[in-house]
């Protein structure tokens, strides 16, 4: 039944997938020589709108990917096991506010840098996730394509946020130094159950953080329009 539901969902999403890809506005800021020279020509307002749209799409696709993975590879007892085992997200140690009151109190500068930290923290883990999903028997192309798409769009989002920091805060371009995790450098192959639970945790945590990126960026947009009405 789970497999049938997953297939139904995959067919439905496949029909919408081309529209999802074409609906997003381009955000690629990097020229072929590696310089971030495209986005600086876009107005600050339009760039923020594009960054928000990218964050919205990334969250939506991450939500679909997590649900598809869950339906195909994670029976309900294992879903409960993950919740009870207390798996932690890789970004838990980052100094990023999580409560509504904390988020409302932070500055625009910290909002942007919080988004950038989240984005950069997930670039390398998503590359790992692409590689490990390729080893799954029966992993649908839809899931593989979604993971690859999110990974590529996350890099575009990073570029957009970096330029946005330059425009809004008049700061130099932030360096993109990734905090490598030993979790993704272990050459030993975990057993299938361990691999499934680890990948499920990654997808679930990324979905949560992608939503947080979207919320922070939309709060920033609200502040640009009317700082007193942003809840």
UniProtKB/Swiss-Prot annotation:
Where is it localised? Secreted
Give TM regions.
Answer: none
Keywords tagged on the record: Disulfide bond, Glycoprotein, Hormone, Secreted, Signal
Q: Which InterPro entries match?
A: 4_helix_cytokine-like_core, Somatotropin/Prolactin, Somatotropin_CS
Q: Name one Pfam family in it.
A: Hormone_1
Disulfide bridge partners, by residue number: 29-39, 89-205, 222-230
- Please name the GO terms of the biological process aspect recorded for this protein, alphabetically: animal organ development; growth hormone receptor signaling pathway; positive regulation of growth; positive regulation of receptor signaling pathway via JAK-STAT; response to nutrient levels
Keyword Iron assigned: no
User: Glycosylation positions?
Assistant: 35, 145
Tissue range of expression? Pituitary gland.
GO MF entries: growth hormone activity; growth hormone receptor binding
Gene Ontology CC annotations of this record: extracellular space
User: Which residues belong to the signal peptide in this entry?
Assistant: 1-24
Q: Which branch of life, at top level? A: Eukaryota
The UniProt entry's sequence similarity note says: Belongs to the somatotropin/prolactin family.
Q: What is this protein called?
A: Somatolactin
Can you name the source organism? Siganus guttatus
